[in-house]
From Swiss-Prot:
Phosphorylated by air-2 in vitro. PANTHER family: MEIOTIC RECOMBINATION PROTEIN REC8 HOMOLOG, SCC1 / RAD21 FAMILY MEMBER. GO terms for biological process: double-strand break repair; meiotic cell cycle; meiotic chromosome movement towards spindle pole; meiotic sister chromatid cohesion; reciprocal meiotic recombination; regulation of centriole-centriole cohesion; synaptonemal complex assembly. The modification Phosphothreonine is found at residue 625. InterPro entries: Rad21/Rec8-like, Rad21_Rec8_N. This is Meiotic recombination protein rec-8. It is found in: Chromosome; Nucleus; Cytoplasm, Cytoskeleton, Spindle pole. Expressed in premeiotic and meiotic gonadal cells. Expressed in spermatocytes. Signal peptide: none annotated. GO terms for molecular function: chromatin binding; damaged DNA binding. Residues 374-418 are annotated as: Disordered.
Amino acid sequence: MVVSAEVIRKDAVFHVAWILGTGDSKKLSRREILDQNLPELCHSIIEMVPERHRGSATKTGLYLLSLLTYGTVLIHQVQVDFLKRDVEKLKELMKKKSFILLMAERFDRNQELQRKEDKFARLRSKPIMCVEELDRVDLAHLQAIGDELGINGNPGDFIMMDALPNMNQWIDNNSELNAIYGCVEPYLREKEITMHSTFVEGNGSNEHNKERRNDAVIADFSQLLFPEIPEITLGEKFPIDVDSRKRSAILQEEQEEALQLPKEASEIVQEEPTKFVSIALLPSETVEQPAPQEPIQEPIQPIIEEPAPQLELPQPELPPQLDAIDLVTIPASQQDMVVEYLQLINDLPDDENSRLPPLPKDLELFEDVILPPPAKKSKVEEEEDALERARRRPSSRPVTPINQTDLTDLHSTVRPEDPSFAIDSQIHDVLPQRKKSKRNLPIIHSDDLEIDEAVQKVLQADYSSLVRKKEDVIAKIPPKTDAVAVLMNLPEPVFSIGYRLPPEVRDMFKACYNQAVGSPVSDDEEDEDEEEEEEYKYAKVCLLSPNRIVEDTLLLEEQPRQPEEFPSTDNINPPRQLQENPVFENLEYEAPPHPIRTARTPTPIKDLKYSVISLFPTPEKRRETSIIAELNLDPIPVEEIDPLLTMRTEEELENVRRRQKSSLGVQFMRTDDLEEDTRRNRLFEDEERTRDAREDELFFYSSGSLLPNNRLNIHKELLNEAEARYPEWVNFNEFTADHDRKKAATAFEGLLLSLKNMKVEAKQEDPYFPILVRHISHEEM
């Protein structure tokens, strides 16, 4: 037998799981999903799994089982989402409660706890016999007494009341035992009895059987126990102290107010015990004609409610709808029987041992006395009946709602029929098709995927030597609160630490600005007017040394100085700015060895030397001074310094065309007419100084990228150099020392490509250290 998809879809257990698993467009309500029993659903799916080597068993396809399993997972997910949403709403609702409501709830909770504490303080275990008559008990009958009362009958169970703890002490001292075995069960007998039952439920006896225990308590043990002694005799023969009287008064109050335990007697017919709350006797003259007049003010309630000695437990209360019953509401056919029964009760003697007469068998007092249900309840029942009739109708078409309100009805569709596992005459092979997921899932390769050896080597290569941490690469600049002397020792330019220097030092190193050192470069072939060209200014940054500005003066060597004309260098004080600043107190000021003067004379003087001033005696400055002294440079006369001579001379047109295709060079607009370009350059020679590409240290403009052939040639140069010097390492920094910036960047790009293609290997010891490159020989590999 084969289970088809149609049978599973109509099954009441798999209906919701099938809809969710197949992605059906039918909408399910919240109640339908929450009503699903997941353990039962999983058990049903397991039962449908076919077993091995059993051809006659019910066969269910793996595809159907997988859909049901997937639907079960979706049901669990939706149920968890509903629970999470409800908890969040409840949490928000609790947050919105006002402070007054919270205080009111806390006050009510404290009142309830106080009431329970007062009740436990008054609660004591209930006695079962009098302590004064304990010696008269026949120990031979003790086992029978224990069996009837529901205790083990051990003599240790009869203990004096003063040796027993109260309820609070019992809970505090035996909390663990209470959690395992239960609490003490009270058994009520007489008023002045002071013996207690101290056994615990679950100790091997049959105390947990409430019906048997109630029958035993209600039964009469006069044959086994001693005869009861009146209170007067007890008082004369065995005086009772004041505390026992107080406890007996408390027990009497609890009997009248708190205790409401069920009571069933073995002699009474197995019917619900009756209790008349407000019933009054009428004279015999008015019984035949009941009227709503005032009843006689002699109630029989005390006689009925006072229990007999054998029945110590109170009667259970009647339902609330029977509290207001009067004789007028009793049917006419039952009134005579009720009056006769009440007359029998009235004629009973005033004896505590007297019992109520049995109820007449034909008395049906409360069968027809049923109050009409509320209007709202009747309306709900009518709606449920209508929905049930619509659900059980033979038609399979769902209920068509009449208005918009019924559209949200949870029972607007037909309940699926019971599953029938009979073999279908026509099994439809058309299974529901799920839509393809729109998510871009990653491609899962097979296990036998072959990877090229070169790719494996690249993936396994260790480039950790080229990776540096950010902390190692970033320049570590001292904080702003460092001393100026520490800043002076740094080999960094002024512009990187100038903002941390005091104003007195910053005034000594001012940057100068050169005007119009370049103009924008465009690759457009169209000519632009000269008026549209904008001039750009660039900042010139100097190192930590005074600006060397050549003026129209000559350095004159002073004649042999006289002692009185020039003071000693030992008495020369540092500048006023350095004296006022306390930062420079510990700095050493070195005066110039040969004081010089400037004179505006065109007469050159031979044998002139540079004079060096060491402003701050730092190691870098001392090294710079020693280098300048070793060079022994001759000063250049001012008339020989011509800025126009430093400009670029005229070049051939072919060289200009080749240079314009390079990446670095501050050039003008590229045009086809090179003669016009040359003429335009001459116009700017008188107004501004055109800087060469190598002189521009900060900014450059590009006239276009390198041609592909030039780019590949630069890459090939590095490979050829590394292959020629194999197995030695090639210093990449020295290799690109003579290159311009863009050519060096292109060479570095070739280095990265060669590393990726495993043609070369590189290493670098520390940041800012030279990069060493070596050719990789694949023959050795």
